[in-house]
Design a protein with these regions (language model features):
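Short, flexible, mixed-charge acidic loops at enzyme active sites
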Residues: 77-89
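Hydrophobic faces of well-ordered beta-strands that scaffold small-molecule active sites
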Residues: 3-7, 33-35, 69-72, 120-123, ...
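Generic structural signal for well-ordered alpha-helices
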Residues: 19-23, 56-60, 106-110, 135, ...
Length: 251
């Protein structure tokens, strides 16, 4: 199995020390990841360091170098209690809203990126949550790809190509054919966590590839049975995570 990486929550006011540490790691091994850029961050949880004016120029330079960029929502603010079509979480910036509301949010995010010199047709939903209305609005705005879903090959659904993430990290390291994504949230990463990623990449370097390799693979239509299975897996994984957090709160 070929493995690529994606980094969520990329903003001008992110944890720059962690980001730059991961940047050096990916540059060292040449496995350029996908970056999920929040066009207009209003989520205080993502605000770690003072915003850097050079952020947008930095993103342009990384894109020119071979890193892949995506639009990570618009504001990264959860305003509904819906899990949508891929319910890893029970909250969303998009799922459950009308077409007009979602189109306006997505169009606003797209314009903010374009105004800063960044063009992408790849969408990354905050919290992994979206619905069929999100996909319809994305398609109307010219987006072609979504980074989400479970699987080991790209697939087509509702006219959009999905580039899957790993259901469980341990399943990504198998002898099966295909390609999947490991998700990284770099803010507040520890030295130990960074070291673990370095060891992971070094031990599997023959299977670690740039995210852009996804675009070389053929995408096939997702069967309804696979869609149902994916929904059940996402709901179960999300529920287990929420129950785990609840247990810790009452421990």
């Amino acid at each position: 199995m070929k493995i690529a990486f994606r980094m969520d929550d990329i903003t001008p006011d992110m944890d720059w020390k962690s980001f730059e540490a991961f940047e050096q790691l990916f540059e060292c091994y040449g496995c350029y990841p996908l970056l999920g850029i929040v066009p207009d961050n209003l989520d205080p949880k993502l605000s770690v360091d003072p915003a850097r004016e050079a952020f947008w120029k930095k993103m342009q330079e990384l894109q020119e170098k071979g890193w892949t960029l995506s639009m990570h929502g618009c504001h990264h603010v959860y305003t509904t209690k819906r899990g949508g079509s891929f319910p890893l979480n029970a909250q969303s910036e998009f799922a459950g809203k009308s077409y007009e509301e979602q189109y306006q949010l997505l169009e606003s995010g797209q314009k903010k990126l374009l105004d800063r010199g960044i063009e992408t047709k790849l969408f990354m939903a905050p919290g992994h949550t979206f619905d069929k209305t999100t996909l319809r609005a994305l398609k109307a705005l010219g987006f072609t790809h979504v980074t989400d879903g479970f699987g080991d090959l790209p697939y087509v659904r509702s006219g959009m190509t999905f580039l899957p993430i790993a259901f469980l990290r341990k399943y990504a390291f198998s002898d099966r054919e295909g390609m999947t994504t490991i998700v990284i949230h770099a803010n507040h990463s520890t030295v130990a966590e960074l070291k673990a990623y370095e060891e992971m990449i070094d031990a599997n370097r023959e299977n670690i590839v740039p995210y852009s390799d996804f675009f070389k693979l053929e995408a096939k239509q997702q069967p309804m049975t696979a869609r149902i299975r994916e929904y059940v897996l996402a709901f179960g994984k999300g529920l287990a995570a929420r129950l785990g957090r609840l247990k810790k709160q009452h421990a």
